[in-house]
């Protein structure tokens, strides 16, 4: 089993457990160049989203594939979710380690007011 397949299996397992809870989830995806985050409802509606591919986020950054960029995405997605009335979420790290950019995004979202 290769690295990507293992990550996707971990992600599927975590998503099934979150679906059983029936709560909104903060989903994180990362590539070498960008970081993406979405708040998704239990019925699969995207309530809020942010990424380093957006012009609004990229204007503040020098480079989009680092921890500082992930912090900006976390703050932005949390602010947008709170505007929609979402304050409590489950964190879906999509099988990625809770380290580096994923952890930075989560910490920034917590500081901006999301609870998980």
Curated annotation (Swiss-Prot):
UniProtKB keywords: Ribonucleoprotein, Ribosomal protein, RNA-binding, rRNA-binding
Molecular functions per Gene Ontology: 5S rRNA binding; structural constituent of ribosome
A GO cellular component annotation in the UniProt record: cytosolic large ribosomal subunit
Coiled coil feature spans: none
GO biological process, one term: translation
Source superkingdom: Bacteria
Pfam annotation, one family: Ribosomal_L18p
Family: Belongs to the universal ribosomal protein uL18 family.
Cited function: This is one of the proteins that bind and probably mediate the attachment of the 5S RNA into the large ribosomal subunit, where it forms part of the central protuberance.
Alphabetized NCBIfam families for the sequence: L18_bact (TIGR00060)
Quaternary context: Part of the 50S ribosomal subunit; part of the 5S rRNA/L5/L18/L25 subcomplex. Contacts the 5S and 23S rRNAs.
This protein's name: Large ribosomal subunit protein uL18
Organism of origin: Shewanella sediminis (strain HAW-EB3)
The organism's taxonomic lineage, starting at the top: Bacteria, Pseudomonadati, Pseudomonadota, Gammaproteobacteria, Alteromonadales
């Amino acid at each position: 089993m290769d690295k990507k397949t293992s990550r996707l299996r971990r992600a599927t397992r975590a998503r099934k457990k979150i679906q059983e809870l029936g709560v909104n989830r903060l989903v994180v995806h990362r590539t070498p160049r960008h970081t993406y985050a979405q708040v998704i409802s239990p019925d699969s509606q995207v309530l809020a989203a942010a990424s380093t591919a957006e012009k609004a986020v990229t204007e503040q950054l020098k480079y989009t594939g680092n921890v500082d960029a992930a912090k900006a995405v976390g703050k932005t997605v949390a602010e947008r979710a709170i505007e929609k009335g979402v304050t409590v979420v489950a964190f879906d790290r999509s099988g990625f380690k809770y380290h580096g950019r994923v952890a930075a995004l989560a910490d920034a979202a917590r500081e901006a007011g999301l609870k998980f």
